[in-house]
Structure formats: C-alpha cells, structure tokens
A protein has these predicted regions:
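Non-catalytic tandem-repeat scaffold regions and their flanking low-complexity/translocation tails
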Residues: 1-256
Length: 256
C-alpha cells in the first residue's frame, strides 16, 4: 500500500503520520510529510527533514508556484535542496522566484541579483537594476544600453543600437526603423506579431533574417479561405496557403 498523487506512488515511509501540507488559506499544496521524510508530490522523497518545522513557503500572493518548501535548516525547490539558501528569510517574491537575505533564486537556482524589489521589469521578459539589463534567468543581456533600452511589444526589445527577440540579438536589424509585423485578423482587428519583425530593409523570424523577403509588403493575415494565418509578401507565401482571397488581395493592392 502507498499514497498516490495523479497516479504516481509517493513512496511514503510512515503512512500513519503522513499528511498533505496546506497553505495559509487552508488549500492543499504540492508538499507532504511524515515523521521521517518530506515529499514533493511528483514522487520526490526528501530524507531527514526537520519534521516539526517542514512547511510549504506561502508566497502570500494570488499567483504563486508552490514550488518552494523549507524546514529550519534547508530550503527546497520541487524536492531538491537549494544549497546555501537561508530558510529563516526565504520567501517567494514572484512566480517561481525566491529571495532570501543573500540573493534572488530563479526556479531554485542562485542568481547574481541581490534584491528583487530593486529591479524594474520591462515587459514580461526583462529586468533592469539601473546598471544592467537581465533576462528571465537573470543573466546579463550583453551589449544592452540601460539608458535607451525599451520594450517594443511581446517578445521584442531594443536600445539605440540593437534589437532583441527575447534575449537573442537580432543581427542586422535597424532599431530606428524596426517594428513587429502587423497582424490583421478579420475577426479581431490588428495586433503585432510575437515572432515576425521587420525594418526598412529586412524581415526577421525571431532572430534570423528571412532571405529575399520584401519588407515593404510583408504581412500576416488570416484570410477566410486560407489555412489559419498566411504570412506573405507581394512575391512569396512563407506560411499558410496561397488562396484565392490572397490573390485577390495582392491584385487589388499591387495590381498582380
């Protein structure tokens, strides 16, 4: 006999003392314990915990990962010990991001950031401490100019001299003329694309140039007779279906 979570055996050592631990609101968490071990409910056994003090770390915020727990001696992420983390001061400050008196942790991994609260977030993928720009793993974005760095939209960022797709440098992109490709939906109007961008000379998919693509006419539209989205310019179809509605659109716009 054993306890199971989502069909997976937890390998509980002492079934009489086993319990699923709750958060401060009384909801079940991903953690359990018996008098010998702690358990992360993916099946990870944490031996030799301090039974009296082993507890989930509640983030005291609506959206939290539930990935962290501690006893009075150690901190754990998904059942793995975080070496050097201070259990007395450790807390979850954002989804999967931990903080103690020493540093910030991303998914249980120590980072070079000392104080999460001193960071400014750019979009959802970048941070700044006023000296450097950091990606989601808190690695420095090499070459980024803090004074001119900005979030364009979604996955796109730039400074005075560079463009990035997430944390990848888009080589050859001109930040003065760069913009994400406009997306036109017959159902929902217009938006900007996560993955396609262009400047005055080139078109890019993520961080790579699309050879021979025509920047002036490059578009993304969901024609009603196409296969979902059609990505095209006046000369080529790069994604989707070369449909009658596309041909009609090109003829009306470019006479071809």
């Amino acid at each position: 006999n054993d306890f199971y979570y989502n069909g997976k055996a937890l390998n509980v050592r002492d079934k009489s003392s086993f319990e699923i631990l709750k958060d401060n609101s009384g909801e079940n968490t991903n953690w359990g314990k018996d008098k010998y071990n702690g358990y992360y409910l993916n099946g990870t056994v944490i031996p030799n915990i301090d039974y009296a003090t082993f507890h989930p770390i509640d983030a005291h915020r609506l959206i939290q990962s539930g990935y962290y727990a501690a006893d009075k001696y150690k901190v754990f992420f998904k059942g793995k010990e975080i070496p050097g983390a201070d259990p007395a001061t450790f807390r979850e400050v954002d989804f999967s991001i931990g903080q103690d008196k020493y540093r910030v942790y991303q998914k249980g991994i120590p980072t070079q950031i000392k104080d999460y609260n001193k960071l400014t977030q750019f979009g959802s993928l970048m941070y700044s401490d006023g000296t450097h720009i950091y990606d989601l793993d808190f690695n420095i974005l090499q070459g980024a100019d803090v004074a001119t760095f900005e979030h364009i939209s979604d996955n796109w960022y730039k400074d005075a001299s560079h463009v990035w797709w997430i944390n990848k440098l888009v080589r050859g992109a001109n930040p003065k003329t760069f913009s994400p490709v406009k997306v036109t939906s017959f159902a929902g109007g217009t938006s900007l694309d996560f993955n396609y961008g262009k400047d005055d000379k080139h078109v890019f998919y993520q961080d790579s140039i699309i050879p021979a693509a025509d920047a002036a006419s490059f578009e993304k539209i969901d024609f009603p007779d196409g296969d979902s989205w059609t990505v095209f310019d006046r000369n080529h179809v790069y994604q989707g279906k070369d449909s009658p509605k596309l041909r009609e659109y090109l003829k009306k716009k470019y006479g071809k």
